[in-house]
């Protein structure tokens, strides 16, 4: 019996024990993120975005955040984590109308669309913080993100590089989830 990709993803999410879900992909972990409870772990990349902002003392509370991307892996969970930090969040995607204008309204822009070089200078303004979550192999064979870094970096206050930005912190978050899960298991 062949399963469709979407059906296969659902099956995998349901088959994994939430106690062993370090990257927030099970329905139980997702529910905990959406409900704001501590029952599971948020997806590591979404948690990495929030951790980066906090590490660099970038205010989140009351800030306008635009998230480009609506996936279960990054777009939706990072939006909910930022809402929990009292940000005002707008979720957009590659087909959102007037996307550059919406992006320029943000204090913090999270680019997680899965399209290499989708966001350039036309979509940003001075004073913004940009978290580039994408990772792709460019036409030149080098890694690149969802932003056109060389265009965006001179305009904004701060931007995460690709490689060496969000992905690096994602690995650290995963390790912290593994340690926390081991501690939980040891205390049961």
State each model region's role:
Residues 1-7, 11:
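Single conserved hydrophobic/aromatic residue that forms the stacking wall/gate
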Residues 2, 51-54, 176-183:
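Short glycine/serine- and small hydrophobic-enriched flexible loop segments
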Residues 2, 17, 57, 101, ...:
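Structural motif
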Residues 4, 46, 168-172:
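Short alpha-helical patches at coil-to-helix transitions and adjacent helical residues
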Residues 5, 72, 95-96, 135-137:
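Glycine-rich beta-alpha junction loops
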Residues 9-23, 27-30, 134-185:
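Rossmann-fold NAD(P)-binding glycine/threonine-rich loop
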Residues 31, 37-125, 129, 144-147:
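Glycine-rich phosphate/diphosphate-binding loop of Rossmann-like nucleotide-binding domains
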Residues 100, 185-188:
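Short, conserved aromatic-histidine micro-motifs
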């Amino acid at each position: 019996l062949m399963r469709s990709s979407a059906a296969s993803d659902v099956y995998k999410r349901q088959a994994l024990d939430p106690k062993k879900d370090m990257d927030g992909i099970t329905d139980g972990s997702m529910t905990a993120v959406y409900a704001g409870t501590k029952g599971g772990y948020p997806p590591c990349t979404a948690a990495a975005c929030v951790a980066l902002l906090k590490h660099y003392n970038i205010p989140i509370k009351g800030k306008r955040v635009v998230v480009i991307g609506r996936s279960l892996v990054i777009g939706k969970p990072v939006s909910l984590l930022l809402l929990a930090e009292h940000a005002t969040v707008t979720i957009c995607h590659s087909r959102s109308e007037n996307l550059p204008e919406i992006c320029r309204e943000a204090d913090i822009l999270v680019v997680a669309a899965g399209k290499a070089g989708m966001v350039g200078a036309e979509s940003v303004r001075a004073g913004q913080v940009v978290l580039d979550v994408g990772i792709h192999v460019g036409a030149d064979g080098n890694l690149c993100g969802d932003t056109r870094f060389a265009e965006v970096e001179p305009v904004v206050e701060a931007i995460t590089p690709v490689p060496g930005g969000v992905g690096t912190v994602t690995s650290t978050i995963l390790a912290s989830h593994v340690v926390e899960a081991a501690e939980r298991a040891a205390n049961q």
